[in-house]
Each structure stands twice: as structure tokens, then as C-alpha cells.
Amino acid sequence: MKNIQDAYGQQLLAQYNRQTATAEIIERDDWFIDFGSDAGSYFTEYEQWSPLEQQTIKRARGRILDIGCGAGRHALYLQQKGFDVTGIDNSPGAIKVSKSRGLKKALVRPLSDIDKFKPNSFDTILMLGNNFGLFGDAENAGLILEKMSRITTTGAQIIAGTRNPYKTDDRDHLEYHQFNKKCGRMPGQIRMRIRFRKTVGEWFDYLFVSPEEMRDILTATDWQIEEFIEQPEEANYFTVISKKSEGNSTADEHR
């Protein structure tokens, strides 16, 4: 990714360098446009996180890979707790910020290249900040989950956050669900790009799923739901996904 296309990274750099950083603009492929997250939210400390997020991150253990680490808020918290943490992001700007903030291991690396890590490198994979969405679609999720299986230890876990797309009464979003179905996509699959000031990112897919859809995605993989961490009234939720034991793995049957 060229720096000029790294709208997300430019936003983080502006915030880190104390410039006036507004929220990024999210543009969807149905021409829906909205403000995304305020830049400051990517720099929040543990005390500012939601109770559910605080509860979830306590499940992290061992050697940790933080996927989509951004400005490093999760990775830095765990590093300060004494964990061996590696952060990756496909945004050069994000990695520059996370390194500047003190993250010792931070790499510009897309999710598709996680198999460049050696086998048995990690005990926990983090996909917080709704980053289960980085799978993009169900088919790609299966491919990436297989790579995750190879780079993690026996008994490893994925700790992820996402959003239930069906917990909305917004007409624009409900119409987009139907638009997606007509395009042969999952209702919560968003094709989007990010704008910040004069910088425009590339189009990419981001996936929101219900708990039931997440279970379906994991069915033919080496992974299974261990626990959902959620509140009934909230659309955002977290999950702990555990690696199946060798005798309980179903992925080999589908390769």
C-alpha cells in the first residue's frame, strides 16, 4: 500500500502529531457516506474501554499476534503487562505510529501474508476493534483461518470483536443488506473505502456477522466458538475462538 493511499494511517499520524484530526469518512459501494471513528478512539487507554472489552482482553495469554493493530492500543497494553506481542497492520502509517508509541514488534503485513510467520509462533491471535471484519468474506475467512492454524500452537485461541449487522433499524443499512444479497454477498459484508482529507484508500471488504453466521464460518475449520462475550442489547460483541484438538479437527476432511 502506497502512503498516499493510506487514508487510515494518515489519520492516525495526524492525531499522533497533534494536528487537528477529524474522523475518517467511510464510503460504501452503494454510495452511502458516513463518519467513521474519531481519531482519538484509536489511542484510548484501558480505563476508557468498554467493560466488555476490558473483560475480553484479559483472556489473552502466551505469545500474541495483534492483527490490525492500528495505533497499538491493545498491543501496548499487553506489552506493558509483560506479554510478547507482535502487531501487524497493512497500513504503513499505523505501524509508524505504533512503533513511535513504543510497540517493540510491529510489522507492515497484510492479513493474507500471516503464513510468513513460522509454525507454532503464537498462542493468541487478537482481532479486536471489530477486526473479525478483516476476513472480508466467508470464503476468505476459511483460507485465513487455515493459515492461522499453521502459525499457532496446540490449544491456541483467537479473541475477536465484531458487530451483529441485524441489530439495526436504520433503513439505509437494511436496504444495504438486500443490496448485498442481490450481489451474492453476506448481508453484513461491507465494500468500503476510507477518506481522510485529500487521501483516499482502496476499496476493500469488511465483514460483520451474527453469532450464528460466525459459527457457520468456523464449521469446516480447525476452530470453534468457546465463548461469546456480549450484552443482549448491544450490537457489538466479542468472542473467544479456540483451536480444536487434533482428534476433533474437521478441517482436514474439507481440504
Name every feature range the model reports, one short phrase each.
Residues 1-59:
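S-adenosyl-L-methionine
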Residues 2, 11-16, 153-213:
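SAM-dependent methyltransferase
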Residues 61-70:
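Conserved class I S-adenosyl-L-methionine
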Residues 91-92:
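Conserved SAM/SAH-binding beta-strand->alpha-helix loop
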Residues 102-114:
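Conserved SAM-binding strand-loop segment of SAM-dependent methyltransferases
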Residues 116-125:
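A short acidic, Gly/Pro-enriched loop at the edge of an enzyme's catalytic core
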Residues 141-154:
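A short glycine-rich, Lys/Arg-flanked "PGG" loop and its adjoining helix->strand segment in the class I
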Residues 252-255:
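Short, low-complexity, charge-dense intrinsically disordered segments
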